[in-house]
């Protein structure tokens, strides 16, 4: 592994991403596939690029990412969180800008569990008057 490599772990919903950053040309590899191949949806690609665009480093860093668990939006959010943490390790002066954009905070929202006696998490069984 390279000496000048920076690491960040990101999580969102049930997804976890490991992000490795090193100086390069803006190449992004996710699970051995390119960003365009891995995320067909443009919104997911946009979410992944948000922290890099904010600090204007889209073509200065190479990213190697492994992500597992969850779906498309959860994985994209986990990658964004991981990239943010790796960028802060790379340069601590980026933290205020990333914090102001809201990328540093882990999004704690996740699926609410189903309760006994209910049909879903909050959906009550149909009420019959007679």
UniProtKB/Swiss-Prot annotation:
Gene3D superfamilies: 3.30.230.10. Transmembrane segments: none annotated. One of its GO terms (biological process) is translation. Keywords: Ribonucleoprotein, Ribosomal protein. Pfam families: Ribosomal_S9. One of its GO terms (cellular component) is cytosolic small ribosomal subunit. The keyword Kinase does not apply. It comes from the Bacteria. One of its GO terms (molecular function) is RNA binding. InterPro entries: Ribosomal_Su5_D2-typ_SF (IPR020568), Ribosomal_uS9 (IPR000754), Ribosomal_uS9_bac/plastid (IPR023035), Ribosomal_uS9_CS (IPR020574), Ribsml_uS5_D2-typ_fold_subgr (IPR014721). Belongs to the universal ribosomal protein uS9 family. This is Small ribosomal subunit protein uS9. It comes from Aliivibrio fischeri (strain ATCC 700601 / ES114) (Vibrio fischeri). The lineage of its organism: Bacteria, Pseudomonadati, Pseudomonadota, Gammaproteobacteria, Vibrionales.
